Design a protein with these regions (language model features):
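Short, charge-patterned binding micro-sites
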Residues: 60
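Radical SAM/AdoMet-radical enzyme domain recognition
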Residues: 1-57
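Accessory C-terminal segments flanking Radical SAM cores
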Residues: 63-160
Length: 160
């Protein structure tokens, strides 16, 4: 949820959003074998306790990473779902968001659990997403590193 960031800052932001009345908060978690797989059910419990939705995302093989070897950390959505089902009952839902997430509901709660599976269940034909990186680059495809530098556009055309 923060990668290598400040988890306390993350908590403050999430609780501030809840406090001011955001009614639909969704947590996005990239899961990695050997890093955070043991936290999956704790994160679902946190989402349930706060009536948040949560989506688990398979890591996309984009960019360089020095923090881990992707071949050793790849963890598929079916494995995450299996871990969750050991502790919670999940049911299929017909809800669609026009996005890549496939949702299930935790029985007896308001929480939806989504699975975004670019590796194990390619969704390119259904994707309607673009991304903005932390350094202001617009990614027209989440699976491609070609991008547009939004920061320079905004700085060079501040009134537009």
């Amino acid at each position: 949820m923060t990668r290598f960031g400040d988890i306390d800052q993350w908590y403050r932001g999430v609780y501030a959003a809840k406090k001011v009345g955001f009614s639909k908060i969704k947590l996005n978690v990239v899961f990695l074998k050997g890093f955070n797989e043991s936290e999956i059910c704790d994160l679902v419990a946190f989402a349930i306790d706060n009536e948040f939705d949560i989506s688990f995302i398979e890591e996309m093989p984009l960019g360089e990473t020095n923090s881990h070897d992707r071949s050793e950390t790849q963890f598929h959505s079916v494995d995450v779902k299996s871990n969750i089902c050991k502790q919670y009952d999940l049911i299929e839902t017909l809800e669609r968001t026009s996005g890549p997430s496939k949702y299930m509901r935790v029985v007896g709660t308001r929480t939806r659990v989504g699975f975004i599976s670019p590796i194990s269940d390619n969704f390119c034909n259904l994707c309607n997403r673009v991304g903005v990186t932390a350094d202001g680059r617009l990614l027209l495809c989440l699976g491609n590193e070609n991008s547009v530098d939004l920061r320079s556009v905004v700085r060079n055309h501040p009134g537009d």
